[in-house]
Amino acid sequence: PSASSTDVITNDNVFQACFTDPNQGTASAQYIADNNLGTKVAVIYDSSSVYSSGIEATFVEEAQNKGLEVVAEEAFTADSKTDFSTQLQKAQSAGADLVFLPIYYTEASIILTQANGMGYEPAFFGVDGMDGILGVENFDTSLAEGVMLLTPFAADADDEKTKAFVSTFKEKYGDVPNQFAADAYDAIYVIKAAIEQAGATPDMSASDLGTALTGAMTSISVDGLTGEGMTWQATGEVSKAPKAVVIKDGAYAAM
């Protein structure tokens, strides 16, 4: 449900619940520029990850279009994701006042810890893969205060659907749900909407069912936890707007 690479929708019958990597990069650059969050930007990304490198590429392109100065593009790989001192030093030396992190929360927690250790205090801005950083084991979550990210889900939203989901999730699992949980929840109801739209019945063959659901996906609109009025293109890409959140007082808060 949280697959965001454009590679996953190369087949005709695959539809995403999560917005694509290119969209995340573009939207992040636009949000940073439009809200004057930084002027000199460094990017630390995982060049061995299609997810991370895909977001990085479109972010840099859109950042330049929006007049942001990208002063450092620092890569790491799956084999070198425990020491980010070199990347942070280059960002600091380049005068970056904002560091963009199109990565997952485990690596992000290490970067925040190491940046704090070297006295480097830029603004940090991430994407949906960082949703979950407050739950990283042995991480000093006070270091995440002020971290911003775009994600399809905000657990502190005050609409009834979100409040009910968060309450039930906490009761069952003892934790606050993140966007990965919300995407999975929405995916079930997207399938339900497609089944109803297609008029699918239990006696349909797997082939006929697949054809019917594929056709229905481009004509449904779903109000979910991760987006209102979500629709799908024939390519499989979902149309929905990300939400900007900031970590404040140890919790995610809408910006």
Regions found by a protein language model. Give the residues of each.
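Extracytosolic ligand-binding ectodomains
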Residues: 1-255
